[in-house]
């Protein structure tokens, strides 16, 4: 088989018997009893109604947010959590644990086997196949825990910004419950795997039937997971640990406190809580002499400023708001100074580049830096220039001389790095931006005025031409009916026609005075 035969959703079941008869002793009896108890723990966690409800909530959230939050980073991380949950269902861990529970002898069978000296137990192929299943399920659960923490961190960022508060609160609560359940299943699988390996050794000594030939199962599941997930810290729940934690309070911080604050803030909060505990718990152990049925009038000072325990709430809140504002301003100043220094370094390295091959590597570094600093415009411009750089790199490899192109390309990269300085935002009130907008408005107004003048002139010329043609059409019938009208009237009409023709000739000198027939004769028709 392959080296990572456990890293499969469907591991083929061995075509061999599921149980064998071996000599039965007290150690095997105790081992099978512990293995059945571990199986019961895993099954109760997997079949929990709370877990199934949280998974259904996850599916419903993804169904609702599919259209509006497709480019949302927490939504993408939630999709990865859903993929892990679906793979955990598809690998059928619950069915495998139930099969092992059925194959293992129950209490009465173990008692009969102890009397007879022999008993039926799971065979070596069955135990090896179950070991592969447990390895795959544990690695998948560790991956699910990692995805849950990443999604939790992303939603925490949006909560700090005050975006989608109700949605992010629902997501964080759901993820925290899923994280607790999957961590509990993983902690229950570790002792189960160890006892499975111990039983496998004893069965292989008496009835050897090797199913895995090219792969050996690791002895400890915790060491196997720490190789791929070094940050994963898993502690087994034992009776001694539970007894020790009953009387003592845990000094470690929970996952929420680790995710929501720095270590220095946690230490300060812890010291403050230790100082406040005697004040807050002072009245709990004193016996009150007040009658519960009688009205009590307690005199207190200003409710808004001082609490009943003597703490200045308003002063505390003002101090916390001031400290948070100061920290945010300091962080912004540090980021600005660091980005300017790194930008100067990038420019110096850009000047030193001597080939497009080095330029391509430098562009990748610049794109990663812009992405980390959230310079999205520069990142887009550099991504476009990287495509050009790839083409120039291929030409350079063919032997084409590209020294001049490299110089112009360096200038383009420098312009792309200073994109935010050259193009300020739309709502900026800087003097260069205002001058630029005024110049653009003046240019557009001039262009619009010239267009209006041209359109007015063209309308006037077209109107005069139409008027002259209409006047000619009206005057021609008068000339044709000159025989029917008196001579005096004909003379006056002809004089008027000559005046009108002279006026039209003055208005439009370019219009020809020939008839339509003369025009066609000039063309040769």
From Swiss-Prot:
Region of interest (Nuclear localization signal), residue spans: 435-453
Source superkingdom: Eukaryota
GO biological process: negative regulation of neuron differentiation; positive regulation of Notch signaling pathway
Keyword Nucleus found: yes
Record InterPro entries: Nepro-associated, Nepro_N
Subcellular location per the Swiss-Prot or TrEMBL entry: Nucleus; Nucleus, Nucleolus
A GO cellular-component term linked to this record: nucleus
Location, primary (coarse class): nucleus
The UniProt record lists the keyword Iron: no
Matches recorded under Pfam families: NEPRO_N
Family to which the UniProt record says this protein belongs: Belongs to the nepro family.
Function (record text): May play a role in the Notch signaling pathway.
Protein name listed in UniProt: Nucleolus and neural progenitor protein
Organism: Danio rerio (Zebrafish)
Protein encoded by which gene: nepro
